[in-house]
Amino acid sequence: MLNHEYWGFIKDPIHGYIRITDSERSIIDTRTVQRLRRIRQLGPGAEYVYPGANHTRFEHSLGCLYLGGILAENLPVRLNAREIRDVRIATLLHDVGHGPFSHVFEPLLNKCTGKTHEDMAEWLIEKSELAEILEKENYEVDKIKRLAVGRTETKKNFLNQIIRSAVDVDKMDFLLRDSYHTGAEYGQIDIFRLIYTMNVLDSNLAVDLTALPTLEAFIIARIGAFRAVYFHRTVRAYQIMMERALRAANEELGFADTKSIQDYLDLDDYSMWIKLKECPKSRNIMKDLERRKLLKCSFEGSFFAKDPLAISLLTNESIRQRLEEQIAEKTKIEPEKVTLDVPSVPSVPYYHSLSTEPMDIPVFYKTRDGKRIPKKLSEVSRIIEPLQVFMNIVRVYTDEEHRERVAKSAREVLSDLPISAEVSY
């Protein structure tokens, strides 16, 4: 993309100056994209542990546009100017479907509509003002809406994987950005080493083995991000309470099942906070959140998802509910005072559209004559090999009054779970 095509630049604390074109500026200035300024990147709760964690999905989306463009421009497989342009705008729009409080809102959205934030992104790109502006700027709306969520049907599957894969620009940006704003220093990764050593094998993105140490650092950093920030016990306590508030208020207000584009765009962190404070069914929870009167973790342990009981815990809500009831019965308190939380920490990044085995990342090495030989990461990295299972955390939350008694009951009820390490409080 030639310099004279750029309209100007935006200064970003992570990537420095991000140049944007006039077409990109017109899309950035839409209500749909500007709404992301009012949706925190980490959702609610992280700022209660890391006070600097107030960054939003807007700057993250700009960072993805920047990295997506660099990756597309530097792939050895030559892309034309239109394809690079499409990748930049699709990465910019990949998060527009998020509801208020980001992933905390998603379970309620999915329960009420059967949709994910990716589905909502496609809907907004196709039906909101974005469609008219994209067409005016000579983009194909259908292609952009699918590419933005990694679902476009193309022989060039690696275009999807720039946005949605095991090592995509979304993850590259949020690891750097979340680390910077929280101050948790897990995110010191040389992402450009990854970008400049990527290639395409059988239509899939792959990383040159010369960058193996950087790829290993990337994977370990992602584990660190989940453990230190995303699934921090206090962050999860806040989010569990917020999920309760959302469910309670939705029974009266019905905001999660909106069929209106404009009504959905009205939902952001600010407007939803006001709704939850004013709704009688959620008001008391919001008062507790405002005073940082949070649920307390009374029991915590870790286990691995290959165990059959562990898998059922993760996938079967009725089993988790039954265990909550058993813990409450032993403690002689109401079931609603016990919450079993089982977040899953991804070891090797797994969320991708590759045709390879789950949790594996294509890598390759070059022979002397320049031939690229594909390998599996698990075959060449001793660091990655033991991380081929998901480490999961099981926590039991209750209020301060019942904390010690619930801890005792939880140990008895969960004694059959293959917990490898228990944390004492």
Go through the PLM ranges and name each one:
Residues 1-86, 96-425:
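Histidine-centered, transition-metal-coordinating active-site segments
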